[in-house]
């Protein structure tokens, strides 16, 4: 069983993180939800605790004796932040550690996936573009948002990807983090990608096989 820390930013897409938490739990992950203060304005603490089966904290000082941010950082096999708001991207890019989520991300050695969601103008703003580049340079995986209907009548890039897509990406992040990072930086919309893990055998003659213990395509 893998331990997944699900960070939730304070955006309207926070409701999608409820389904993501359930999907991750259903496939066998131990999920710990860490919402920001703003996220609790969209989805309350009891909902997160019911979906994850674990207590939910937002501040470093909520559970001082257990040093929660270090405990989560060390136990996590992966951290996924969905939605990652423009504010969260800026704080993480700057190395801020002013709540439980940012301190956990800063302290972990586990792979981190950020799934941004915001208005198109905010996503394309030069400051956000620079922050995303900084985060990727620091080794965090930033998955580009989907394109479609946004809050209100606007449409464009900035939608949080479907929860099932993020859940599949989390599994990839845990098993093959390098591949996940490469895929996240490419526009794969409308393309089919096949990932094959495990041994392969290739016939080179009627009597000989070329065998590989592991393969990745």
Regions picked out by a protein language model, each given a short descriptive name:
Residues 8, 12-19, 87-102, 202-206:
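Short glycine/serine/threonine-rich phosphate/pyrophosphate-binding segments
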């Amino acid at each position: 069983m893998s331990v997944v820390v699900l960070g939730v930013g304070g955006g309207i897409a926070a409701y999608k993180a409820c389904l993501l938490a359930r999907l991750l739990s259903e496939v066998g992950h131990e999920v710990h939800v860490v919402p920001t203060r703003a996220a609790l304005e969209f989805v309350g603490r009891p909902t997160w605790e019911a979906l994850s089966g674990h207590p939910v904290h937002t501040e470093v000082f909520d559970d001082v004796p257990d040093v929660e941010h270090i405990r989560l950082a060390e136990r996590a096999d992966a951290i996924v932040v969905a939605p990652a708001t423009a504010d969260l991207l800026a704080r993480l890019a700057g190395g801020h550690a002013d709540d439980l989520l940012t301190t956990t991300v800063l302290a972990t050695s586990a792979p981190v996936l950020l799934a941004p969601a915001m208005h198109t103008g905010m996503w394309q703003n030069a400051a956000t573009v620079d922050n995303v580049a900084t985060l990727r340079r620091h080794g965090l995986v930033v998955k580009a948002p989907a394109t479609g209907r946004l809050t209100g009548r606007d449409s464009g890039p900035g939608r949080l990807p479907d929860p099932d897509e993020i859940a599949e990406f989390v599994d990839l992040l845990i098993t093959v983090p390098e591949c996940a990072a490469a895929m996240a930086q490419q526009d794969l919309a409308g393309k089919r990608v096949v990932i094959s893990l495990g041994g392969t055998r290739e016939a080179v003659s009627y009597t000989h096989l070329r065998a590989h213990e592991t393969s990745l395509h």
